C-alpha cells in the first residue's frame, strides 16, 4: 500500500498587519489593561464609560457551549446596558452585602489577540485570571474573554464582553459577585 501525501495549505495565523488599517495591537492592549485597572481600583463608573450605549456583558454557565445564547440558556450574568448600569450602582453601595466591605481584586489579562476587524467592529480574545481576596479567603476565576469593540469618536469602546470561565463549577466560590 502506498502512502498518499496530502498537500494542505499551511495554517495562516492572523497578524497585526492584517488589521492595521482598523486598529493596532497596542490600542487593544491599552484598553484591556486600563479596564483591568479600573476594576481593581473599584472605579466602576469609569469602567462603565468604556462601554457603548448598546452594550452587553455575559458570563455563561460553565456547562454551556461558547455559542450559547442568553435568550434560551441560563447564564450567570446576562446584562444589557441598563442592567450593567444597575449592577455598577448596586456594587458601589454599602447595601451590596456580598461586596461590603469590598473585595480586593487583581485582574490579569494575557494572550490578547485580534481575531477580526473591519470598519465597524473589532473582535478580540484574551485570557484572564481574576483573583478575589476578602476576609482571609482567596478565590481565582480563570477563563477567556471575547470582546466586540467599536471605535466611537476616535476611542475604542466595548460593545460586548463575554467571559468564559474555565472552572468546572463555581465551587468553592459559590457566586460571581465581582466583575470579571
Curated annotation (Swiss-Prot):
Pathway: Aromatic compound metabolism; p-cumate degradation; acetaldehyde and pyruvate from p-cumate. Keywords: Aromatic hydrocarbons catabolism, Dioxygenase, Oxidoreductase. Coiled coil: none annotated. It holds the Pfam family Ring_hydroxyl_B. The keyword Oxidoreductase applies. GO terms for biological process: 3-phenylpropionate catabolic process. It comes from the Bacteria. InterPro entries: NTF2-like_dom_sf, Rng_hydr_dOase-bsu. One of its GO terms (molecular function) is dioxygenase activity. Induction: Induced by p-cumate and repressed by CymR. Signal peptide: none annotated. The p-cumate 2,3-dioxygenase multicomponent enzyme system is composed of an electron transfer component and a dioxygenase component (iron sulfur protein (ISP)). The electron transfer component is composed of a ferredoxin reductase (CmtAa) and a ferredoxin (CmtAd), and the dioxygenase component is formed of a large alpha subunit (CmtAb) and a small beta subunit (CmtAc). Component of the p-cumate 2,3-dioxygenase multicomponent enzyme system which catalyzes the incorporation of both atoms of molecular oxygen into p-cumate to form cis-2,3-dihydroxy-2,3-dihydro-p-cumate. The beta subunit seems to have a structural role in the holoenzyme. Also able to catalyze the cis-dihydroxylation of indole-2-carboxylate and indole-3-carboxylate. Belongs to the bacterial ring-hydroxylating dioxygenase beta subunit family. This is p-cumate 2,3-dioxygenase system, small oxygenase component.
Amino acid at each position: 500500500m502506498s502512502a498518499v501525501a496530502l498537500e494542505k495549505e499551511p495554517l495562516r495565523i492572523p497578524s497585526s498587519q492584517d488589521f492595521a488599517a482598523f486598529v493596532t495591537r497596542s490600542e487593544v492592549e491599552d484598553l484591556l489593561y486600563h479596564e483591568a485597572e479600573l476594576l481593581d481600583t473599584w472605579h466602576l463608573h469609569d469602567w462603565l464609560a468604556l462601554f457603548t450605549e448598546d452594550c452587553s456583558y455575559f458570563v455563561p454557565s460553565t456547562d454551556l457551549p461558547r455559542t450559547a445564547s442568553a435568550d434560551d440558556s441560563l447564564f450567570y450574568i446576562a446584562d444589557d446596558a441598563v442592567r450593567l448600569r444597575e449592577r455598577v450602582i448596586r456594587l458601589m453601595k454599602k447595601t451590596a452585602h456580598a461586596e461590603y466591605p469590598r473585595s480586593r481584586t487583581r485582574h490579569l489579562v494575557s494572550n490578547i489577540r485580534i481575531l477580526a476587524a473591519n470598519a465597524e467592529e473589532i473582535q478580540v480574545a484574551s485570557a484572564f485570571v481574576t483573583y478575589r481576596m476578602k476576609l482571609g479567603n482567596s478565590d481565582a476565576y480563570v477563563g477567556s474573554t471575547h470582546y466586540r469593540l467599536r471605535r466611537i469618536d476616535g476611542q475604542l469602546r466595548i460593545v460586548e464582553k463575554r467571559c468564559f470561565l474555565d472552572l468546572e463549577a463555581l465551587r468553592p466560590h459559590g457566586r460571581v459577585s465581582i466583575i470579571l
